[in-house]
Amino acid sequence: MHDKILILDFGSQVTQLIARRVREAHVYCEIHPNDVSDDFVREFAPKAVILSGSHASTYEDHQLRAPQAVWDLGVPVLGICYGMQTMAVQLGGKVEWSDHREFGYAEMRAHGHTRLLDGIEDFTTAEGHGMLKVWMSHGDKVAELPPGFALMASTPSCPIAGMADEARGYYAVQFHPEVTHTVKGRQIIERFVLQIAGAKPDWIMKNHIEEAVAKIREQVGDEEVILGLSGGVDSSVAAALIHRAIGDQLTCVFVDHGLLRLNEGKMVLDMFEGRLHAKVVHVDASDQFLGHLAGVTDPEAKRKIIGREFVEVFQAEAKKLSKAKWLAQGTIYPDVVESGGTKTKKATTIKSHHNVGGLPETLGLKLLEPLRDLFKDEVRELGVALGLPPEMVYRHPFPGPGLGVRILGEVKREYAELLRRADAIFIEELRNTTATAQDAAAGLCGEADVGKSWYDLTSQAFAVFLPVKSVGVMGDGRTYDYVTSLRAVQTTDFMTAHWAHLPYALLGRASNRIINEVRGINRVVYDISGKPPATIEWE
């Protein structure tokens, strides 16, 4: 039996990251709404409780509170941002609106040598104070500590940035240790979970395979399942996991919607029919998809259309399978959280994902999502544990709507042809270029990265088609052609990301090849936006 950490979600967009950090410590955790009952909390029997952040205000919203059972259990509790504020209010402290709202990096001083922060620091001041580089995102602040609490951390703008009641194991921080922007955040959460809570680090993907296979068999029984296979990491791992559980009861439906990468269809069929010996049905529905997308420019509308058409294709294929009762998808945690689909339904929607936003209530198939609770790196670990080849497992993620969300505005067959060729050139240059000692010296990568391909050193890379034209010169003639943007990011969880600092020579070669080899594109730009404020995909 795994030790469990209970994460109470107050509606933050990054609550899922808390779960990821806990699981990185190999400890099992679950996310549940903040308004679960006292009986639920007691029956869950957590080793510790973590209270998430929220876009709400403790000063204004008196309904968002943790169940009383959290404070009655006698287990350690960690409050993060809003979680700190509700802890303060519920235990007798005071919270007030701050005149100075903090959003972004801050340098925080630790106080009191608490079990949570003692010895964890990014640098020390001339006076010997331990300092942490943290990520803040709050408007309210704790103005008065609850009885029994001591100051644990502060910033110039937030005098009480952390508080602790060591006797009861209650800790709270105003910053977000779960995001990668907080340099030592992972270490802080790991210390809370392993040392303060004393949870056993026995959550590993091999264990998850056994549990997931058993759950799939229990859900499906002797019924048949169809799965939309895109060739991406998520659908591939989902297919392998389901195939292990139910074998030939699974039929993979590979839909060519006209928005795939270059030569992707052949690769997918060779991989799944040849290597995994899975049943694969190939459906060419490009005319259907592109026809419905004609004239549509709104990103949300495009995603909804693509999701709807996927469902219609699946329903048509399901009718040919007498026992097909289930539609399987490679939905993962980031898909759910960015669609406002956390279990609390309190997160603010950023964009709809076709996996969760395009399914009508009238769907005649039940939904099977075996990866729904996993992050991308967990999915990759699971794929390796299932025996999938590295070239599949470590391939960069590709969105379900395909090139449909990488072509800004209206989707046309002509645009898709230009984009897939430009994208293939960029990916080829990334694969064929290795990091050098000079790159490391320039700070573009670490010394341990020298010799690795830049494809492996980036988490996701692709080209984006911009439906605008610019003037250029080719030979002695004037050109008036389209623009493409190259995008490459580095991230550990895909919830936050930094733009990749690629060598200029690599970018130069990619740009030169695209302009010379892809007739119709005469200008290439590079996207240097992080997430946040931008999302990884442009649409």
From Swiss-Prot:
InterPro entries: Class_I_gatase-like (IPR029062), GATASE (IPR017926), GMP_synth_C (IPR001674), GMP_synth_GATase (IPR004739), GMP_synthase (IPR022955), GMPS_ATP_PPase_dom (IPR025777), NAD/GMP_synthase (IPR022310), Rossmann-like_a/b/a_fold (IPR014729). Its EC number is 6.3.5.2. Pathway: Purine metabolism; GMP biosynthesis; GMP from XMP (L-Gln route): step 1/1. Pfam families: GATase, GMP_synt_C, NAD_synthase. It catalyses: XMP + L-glutamine + ATP + H2O = GMP + L-glutamate + AMP + diphosphate + 2 H(+). Residues 4-202 form the Glutamine amidotransferase type-1 domain. Keywords: ATP-binding, Glutamine amidotransferase, GMP biosynthesis, Ligase, Nucleotide-binding, Purine biosynthesis. Residues 203-395 form the GMPS ATP-PPase domain. The active site is at 81 (nucleophile), 176, 178. GO terms for cellular component: cytosol. GO terms for molecular function: ATP binding; GMP synthase activity. ATP binds at residues 230-236. NCBIfam families: guaA_Cterm (TIGR00884), guaA_Nterm (TIGR00888), PRK00074.1 (NF000848). Homodimer. Catalyzes the synthesis of GMP from XMP. This is GMP synthase [glutamine-hydrolyzing]. It comes from Burkholderia cenocepacia (strain HI2424). The lineage of its organism: Bacteria, Pseudomonadati, Pseudomonadota, Betaproteobacteria, Burkholderiales.
